[in-house]
Amino acid sequence: MLNEIKNEILCVRGNCDAEVDQMVLQFPIMADYAVLEIDGRTIYATHGHIYNESNLPPLRKGDILLHGHTHVPKCAIHEDYICMNPGSVSLPKEDTHHGYMILENGKFFWKDISGENVGKYHE
């Protein structure tokens, strides 16, 4: 399923991902983090077991920390940064949907596994 949209996916390694997982995928998943610069704002994407709201990576005012690990979707707007969690496609927790996040036209959308919008995170 994911290999079909491999050119549209940005993934970072989770705390349970291994090299054997990478062998069946046609897009990279083994990076510890990814840094994107979009519209003058930095998005720091990481799994969240190392860098998270309690242990921040180097961020500037207005930057976005995007992490998973808890498998619970979230958007927390702090004074200096925004923290977002897309939840989990495979193992959602706290009665949340199987879901993922997309960035489209400067907005983050949380979608369920069928592709339906469940929420908008940031404008």
Where are these regions (language model features)?
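Generic structural signal for conserved hydrophobic packing positions in ordered secondary structure
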Residues: L2, L36, A45-H47, G87
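Non-catalytic terminal accessory segments
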Residues: K6, H122-E123
